[in-house]
Amino acid sequence: MPKMKTHSGAKKRFKLTGSGKVKRQQANRRHYLEHKSSRLTRRLAGDQIVSTPGEAKAIKRMLGK
């Protein structure tokens, strides 16, 4: 049986941590930053862990893990 292909969009957006959690970047930090406060842009700088177990499971399946 052939191997499953990795979802290209998912592999660009998500990374797995050593413990198996799914890491993602936060939204709203790509453009139009001029009118956003420095406080907001700093807060959006860090990565987040995907909190919903169902979503994390679906992402892992797309990544082939």
Swiss-Prot record:
<dbReference type="InterPro" id="IPR001706">
    <property type="entry name" value="Ribosomal_bL35"/>
</dbReference>
<dbReference type="Pfam" id="PF01632">
    <property type="entry name" value="Ribosomal_L35p"/>
</dbReference>
<feature type="region of interest" description="Disordered">
    <location>
        <begin position="1"/>
        <end position="29"/>
    </location>
</feature>
<dbReference type="InterPro" id="IPR021137">
    <property type="entry name" value="Ribosomal_bL35-like"/>
</dbReference>
<keyword id="KW-0687">Ribonucleoprotein</keyword>
<dbReference type="InterPro" id="IPR018265">
    <property type="entry name" value="Ribosomal_bL35_CS"/>
</dbReference>
<dbReference type="GO" id="GO:0006412">
    <property type="term" value="P:translation"/>
</dbReference>
<dbReference type="InterPro" id="IPR037229">
    <property type="entry name" value="Ribosomal_bL35_sf"/>
</dbReference>
<comment type="similarity">
    <text>Belongs to the bacterial ribosomal protein bL35 family.</text>
</comment>
<protein>
    <recommendedName>
        <fullName>Large ribosomal subunit protein bL35</fullName>
    </recommendedName>
</protein>
<dbReference type="GO" id="GO:0022625">
    <property type="term" value="C:cytosolic large ribosomal subunit"/>
</dbReference>
<dbReference type="GO" id="GO:0003735">
    <property type="term" value="F:structural constituent of ribosome"/>
</dbReference>
<keyword id="KW-0689">Ribosomal protein</keyword>
